[in-house]
């Protein structure tokens, strides 16, 4: 009798749960929005859940479904939560710029207790806290401040040249390597010095602390993939499931390192116009008014900004550099043109480039911009709709007779936009000429946004671009790159990654041909 009652309760609970999911999964059909039929319980995240495809590339596949080519939006289900993929350019502009006050938060979240550095950093922080810290950090990233950082970056550029030279000498002038790792060592050292005033020495020691923790951060193991999956698709469960964007050991490392640097900076009174100066200033500002609430009274809030600056700063630049070198190896004629432009400028500058000079290199800029089109590091943007008190909710008219509901997640498929033949001729072809001065005017603004758009765009885009350019200049100064047996013929992306990463890495041969060293004396 008891067993029968237990079975009845279990069956009833399962039926109720199934009915609830089915009810949720009929939402878009009931609202008259075109949608992709969901899988029971897990919605439209089956391939992501099984780690068969990354979410960014899955969004791209949905975007490119021929049945949906004329639709402005597509309804999907993030597990049981109804969400929207935005296809129309004007709607994207509305979300990111015009109606930003309704979409100022990301849908993804972190656990405020188990992962305070994840919860409090500029990427994830919400509402008024986001606006406050964004305003305080913006002065670090002005063109004037970035120009001041360039001299420090150049020192790391020289370290990269020497590291390549040492490896070449050990291998008769050429060697095969996974190029992303070298690029990550460079960008790690660069970010550490320009943001924190620390010599990370990753180029000298690939297992140095900063590089070791950075490598772990973006190595998408099953456990890391699970953390990102829950943070982006089940954000309400991050606390229950103890999800960590920043792992416990990384958080400990950042607290110890940044805390020490801040204390030393306060003790010495040294000013470097870097991120640490801003964090020290915020802490002093909070201490000056002890009776008033201030987010900087929370040390983790300050360390969180350093943590996200470091991780985002090295990953974006190293990815851009490695994808650029992959394309240069595939297109030797483009590589020659780029190296000739770099070499001519280096000869003119006596072996180095001023800030103004590197920014003036036209073909270098074209190559980097095209790399960011084909390989946007963050292949999608996520936002959460928020109703505004006293105002009607946002309508999707004239496209659909539907009004957004509070808490609805929306996804902007950046990779898909960057590869849409509606906006790009032969989008799968690597063609820097798209970004020539003559052709740049033809680009549809919202169809190209490697750093996002509007108030929530990437605050460090200037640094990221400059760092990528300097890294390429330093590497190509006396070295060429070419394909080897391990080089992928066609790029495949890691299906576990939430940022765009080559599956298995990018293996290239680096050849020390001493282009600059041989040409400089004869042209002086």
From Swiss-Prot:
Heme binds at residue 458. GO terms for cellular component: endoplasmic reticulum membrane. It is found in: Endoplasmic reticulum membrane; Microsome membrane. Disulfide bonds: none annotated. It is an enzyme of class 1 (oxidoreductase). GO terms for molecular function: heme binding; iron ion binding; monooxygenase activity; oxidoreductase activity, acting on paired donors, with incorporation or reduction of molecular oxygen. One of its GO terms (biological process) is insecticide catabolic process. It is a peripheral membrane protein. Its EC number is 1.14.-.-. Pfam families: p450. Necessary and sufficient for resistance to insecticides DDT and imidacloprid. May be involved in the metabolism of insect hormones. Belongs to the cytochrome P450 family. This is Cytochrome P450 6g1. It comes from Drosophila melanogaster (Fruit fly).
């Amino acid at each position: 009798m008891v067993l029968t009652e237990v079975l009845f309760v279990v069956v009833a609970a399962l039926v109720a749960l199934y009915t609830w999911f089915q009810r949720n999964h009929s939402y878009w059909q009931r609202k008259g929005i075109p949608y992709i039929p969901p899988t029971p319980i897990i919605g439209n995240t089956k391939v992501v859940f099984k780690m068969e495809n990354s979410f960014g590339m899955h969004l791209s596949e949905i975007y490119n479904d021929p049945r949906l080519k004329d639709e402005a939006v597509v309804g999907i289900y993030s597990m049981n939560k109804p969400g929207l993929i935005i296809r129309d350019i004007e709607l994207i502009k509305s979300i990111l710029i015009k109606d930003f006050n309704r979409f100022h938060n990301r849908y993804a979240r972190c656990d405020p207790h188990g992962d305070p550095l994840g919860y409090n950093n500029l990427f994830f922080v919400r509402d008024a806290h986001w606006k406050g810290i964004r305003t305080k950090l913006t002065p670090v990233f002005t063109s004037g401040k970035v120009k001041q950082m360039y001299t420090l970056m150049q020192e790391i550029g020289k370290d990269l040249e020497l590291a390549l030279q040492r490896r070449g000498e050990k291998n008769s002038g050429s060697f095969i390597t996974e190029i992303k790792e070298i690029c990550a060592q460079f960008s790690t050292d660069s970010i550490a010095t320009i943001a924190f005033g620390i010599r990370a020495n990753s180029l000298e020691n690939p297992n140095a602390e900063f590089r070791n923790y950075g490598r772990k951060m973006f190595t998408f193991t099953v456990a890391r993939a699970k953390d990102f999956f829950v943070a982006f698709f089940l954000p309400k469960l991050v606390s229950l499931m103890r999800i960590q964007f920043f792992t416990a050991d990384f958080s400990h490392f950042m607290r110890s390192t940044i805390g020490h640097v801040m204390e030393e900076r306060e003790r010495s009174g040294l000013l470097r116009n870097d991120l640490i100066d801003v964090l020290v200033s915020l802490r002093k500002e909070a201490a000056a008014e002890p009776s008033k609430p201030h987010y900087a009274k929370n040390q983790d809030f300050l360390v969180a900004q350093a943590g996200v600056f470091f991780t985002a700063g090295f990953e974006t630049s190293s990815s851009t550099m490695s994808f650029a070198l992959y394309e240069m190896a595939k297109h030797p004629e483009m590589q020659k043109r780029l190296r000739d432009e770099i070499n001519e400028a280096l000869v003119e500058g006596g072996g180095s480039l001023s800030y103004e000079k590197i920014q003036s290199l036209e073909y270098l800029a074209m190559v980097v911009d095209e790399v960011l089109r084909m390989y946007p590091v963050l292949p999608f943007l996520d936002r959460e709709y928020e109703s505004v008190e006293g105002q009607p909710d946002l309508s999707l008219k004239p496209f659909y007779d539907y009004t957004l509901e509070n808490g609805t997640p929306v996804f902007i498929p950046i990779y898909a936009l960057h590869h849409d033949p509606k906006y790009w001729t032969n989008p799968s072809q690597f063609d820097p000429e798209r970004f020539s001065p003559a052709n740049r005017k033809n680009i549809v603004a919202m169809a190209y946004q490697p750093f996002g758009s509007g108030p929530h765009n990437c605050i460090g885009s200037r640094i990221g671009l400059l760092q990528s350019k300097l890294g390429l200049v330093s590497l190509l100064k006396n070295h060429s790159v070419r394909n080897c047996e391990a080089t992928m013929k066609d790029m495949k992306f890691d299906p576990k990654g939430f940022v765009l990463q080559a599956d298995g890495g990018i293996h290239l041969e680096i050849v020390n041909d001493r282009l600059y060293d041989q040409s400089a004396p004869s042209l002086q």
